[in-house]
């Protein structure tokens, strides 16, 4: 009912407003004296406004007076709200147009950087763009694959160059050592006025630095035990075991195998620093062996004994071990002795001029594996061995992999069946002393 009344009042007001407008238009050109007779229409307040801002109004149209509802004052507010909404809609339209322009700007540019007109439907343009991106990705993938192949080729060339440079360095060092050896021998032969070795050793000699066991022998030490030596003053001194009895004495022991109390399946760092008990089983250490063989020209003696009581030896008139940079490369001279030259067995098994290999560092010439890992030890392997004094210690003959202490020229070894029992050694010892030492 209220809605119907409100609708009727609104229609009456609008009709009145339209009548006023029409009346005003028709009487615009009437003279002033005729304007006096026009009926006045007034919109006036009929009371005080309430707190909510609702004010009562009435329209006077003599003889008619129409009282408007209080909500009539809200018409102006509604009108303003509609205007605001129209402005918001217009603003959103403009924003949408800007977005469309920006999206067009992000499209594919032409060769000159200008936007090209679209010749197809939006879906077709998107599909074309996807295909172009896929083509670019495939092209980049192909280029990346080619780059990886080139990197691998360069790595291979670099390794070859490093190997060539290493061989050149080794040959250079070997030639320098050989030249120095020749010079020393020449000077020793020309020194005819020098006092004899017997005269030198007959007088007590006081050494400030003992480079090896022969220096202790020279001052009268005859007891086989541990002594402290300093082969290189630039490096720290260290203890060694001296054999003062075998073949005139003065020997510095590098390695000893007696009872299997020490494990020789060790890492590169262990063989580098040394391990074991100097009075029982041990490896002196590759760094120390290098310093000892660098300070003087040394000879090498190897003593072997099997469980049958057979004792044989091998003697080499030169022995030198390079530094770690050259992977402790081995050099031995001419052979003499009773055990046979197992270090230079034949052209296929030759330990001379070979690098040191351990289970965790492969420097041997076997292309399909690590000889140190297979034979459980560190040694100057070829591909793989005709000798290995650092193999496992077996207390009797054994079968399987020949990973025990091994000397390929030992009597009876060549007759053994490959799948049969292998001989083992009771004792093995490596020791050095200066080449020109005289007891």
Curated annotation (Swiss-Prot):
Domain Fibrinogen C-terminal: from-to ranges: 204-436
SMART domains for this protein: FBG (SM00186)
A single GO BP: T cell activation via T cell receptor contact with antigen bound to MHC molecule on antigen presenting cell
Keyword Transport annotated: no
Main location: secreted
Record region (Disordered): 103-126
Residues with glycosylation annotation: 25, 179, 235, 263, 336
Disulfide bond positions: 213-242, 371-384
SUPFAM superfamilies per record: Fibrinogen C-terminal domain-like
Residues in the signal sequence: 1-23
PROSITE patterns: FIBRINOGEN_C_1, FIBRINOGEN_C_2
Database matches in PANTHER family: FIBRINOGEN/TENASCIN/ANGIOPOEITIN (PTHR19143), FIBROLEUKIN (PTHR19143:SF189)
Protein name per Swiss-Prot or TrEMBL: Fibroleukin
Organism expressing this protein natively: Homo sapiens (Human)
């Amino acid at each position: 009912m209220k809605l119907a009344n409100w609708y009727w009042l609104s229609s009456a007001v609008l009709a009145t407003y339209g009548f006023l407008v029409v009346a005003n238009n028709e009487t615009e050109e009437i003279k002033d004296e005729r304007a006096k007779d026009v009926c006045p229409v007034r919109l006036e307040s009929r009371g005080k406004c309430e707190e909510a801002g609702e004010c009562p109004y009435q329209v006077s149209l003599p003889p008619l007076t129409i009282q408007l509802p209080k909500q009539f004052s809200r018409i102006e507010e509604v009108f303003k709200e509609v205007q605001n909404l129209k402005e918001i809609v217009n603003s959103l339209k403009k924003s949408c147009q800007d977005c469309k322009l920006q999206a067009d700007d992000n499209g594919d540019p032409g060769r000159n950087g200008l936007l090209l007109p679209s010749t197809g439907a939006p879906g077709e343009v998107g599909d074309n763009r996807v295909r172009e991106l896929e083509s670019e990705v495939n092209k980049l993938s192909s280029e990346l694959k080619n780059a990886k192949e080139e990197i691998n080729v360069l790595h291979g060339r670099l390794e070859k160059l490093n190997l060539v440079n290493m061989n050149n360095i080794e040959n250079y060092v070997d030639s320098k050592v050989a030249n120095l050896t020749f010079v020393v021998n020449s000077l020793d032969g020309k020194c005819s006025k020098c006092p004899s070795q017997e005269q030198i050793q007959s007088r007590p000699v006081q050494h400030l630095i003992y480079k090896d066991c022969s220096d202790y022998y020279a001052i009268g030490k005859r007891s086989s035990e541990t002594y402290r030596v300093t082969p290189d003053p630039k490096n720290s001194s260290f203890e060694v075991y001296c054999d003062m009895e075998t073949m005139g004495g003065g020997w510095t022991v590098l390695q000893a195998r007696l009872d299997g109390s020490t494990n020789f399946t060790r890492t590169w760092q262990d063989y580098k620093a040394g391990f074991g008990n100097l009075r029982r089983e041990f490896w002196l250490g590759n760094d120390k062996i290098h310093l000892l063989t660098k300070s003087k020209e040394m000879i090498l003696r190897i003593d072997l004994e099997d469980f049958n009581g057979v004792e044989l030896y091998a003697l080499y008139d030169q022995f030198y071990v390079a530094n770690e940079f050259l992977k402790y490369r081995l050099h031995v001279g001419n052979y003499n002795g009773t055990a046979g030259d197992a270090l230079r067995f034949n052209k296929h098994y030759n330990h001379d001029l070979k690098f040191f290999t351990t289970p965790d560092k492969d420097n041997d010439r076997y292309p399909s594996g690590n000889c140190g890992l297979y034979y459980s030890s560190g040694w100057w392997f070829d591909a793989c061995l005709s000798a290995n004094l650092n193999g496992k210690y077996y207390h009797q003959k054994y079968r399987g992999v020949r990973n025990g202490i091994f000397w390929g020229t030992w009597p009876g070894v060549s007759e053994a069946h490959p799948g049969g029992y292998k001989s083992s050694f009771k004792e093995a010892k490596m020791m050095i002393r200066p080449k020109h030492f005289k007891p």
